[in-house]
């Protein structure tokens, strides 16, 4: 299991990223560490929000690196929506530049921290 962290200072957000080979093996540890209730670990990725400004990105590496990259994009999109809502910004299809930059920032940070 690999655990990395980063901040999004502009929105005062704290992100934990957990990468595991088979998250089912870590379910008890992860549930205690992040105060989770999820017991079904047959997934590619998940987002848990512990508070308005603390989020946990769970990534399951058992499907391989190529699948992992698309999962990071997918979960980064969900996380960008969660963050935008938590800071009071409603998604706007005609003015979505802020969300596009946030999505890129999240994806690039996760990719860099996990050395992918």
Residue spans of the language-model regions?
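Short, charged/polar N-terminal "headpieces" of proteins
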Residues: 1-38
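Short, solvent-exposed segments of well-ordered alpha helices
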Residues: 63, 67, 91-94
């Amino acid at each position: 299991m690999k655990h990395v962290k980063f901040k999004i200072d502009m929105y005062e957000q704290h992100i934990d990223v957990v990468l595991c080979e088979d998250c089912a093996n870590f379910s008890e540890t992860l549930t205690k560490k992040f105060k989770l209730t999820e017991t079904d670990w047959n997934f590619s990725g998940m987002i848990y929000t512990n508070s308005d400004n603390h989020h946990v990105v769970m990534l399951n590496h058992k499907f391989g690196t190529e699948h992992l990259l698309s999962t990071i994009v997918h979960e980064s999109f969900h996380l960008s929506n969660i963050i935008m809502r938590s800071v009071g910004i409603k998604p706007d299809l005609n003015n979505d530049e802020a969300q596009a930059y946030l999505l890129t920032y999240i994806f690039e940070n996760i990719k860099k921290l996990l050395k992918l």
